[in-house]
Amino acid sequence: MARGDYYSDDGTTDKEMCPRCGDTFLAAHDDRQVCGRCGYTEWE
């Protein structure tokens, strides 16, 4: 999936960004969100 597919027509997105990297989306799993670049993990 292309990065542009995550944005709506008005330029907003519902996906969360990594607080460490800043320009990377967090991958949503069942019990956590993970940054594929630096490994940052948020447990739910």
From Swiss-Prot:
Its cofactor is Zn(2+). Zn(2+) binds at residues 18, 21, 35, 38. GO terms for cellular component: ribonucleoprotein complex; ribosome. One of its GO terms (biological process) is translation. Gene3D superfamilies: 6.20.50.180. A zinc finger (C4-type) spans 18-38. Binds 1 zinc ion per subunit. The keyword Ribonucleoprotein applies. Keywords: Metal-binding, Ribonucleoprotein, Ribosomal protein, Zinc, Zinc-finger. Pfam families: Ribosomal_S27. One of its GO terms (molecular function) is structural constituent of ribosome. Signal peptide: none annotated. Belongs to the eukaryotic ribosomal protein eS31 family. Part of the 30S ribosomal subunit. This is Small ribosomal subunit protein eS31. The gene is rps27ae.
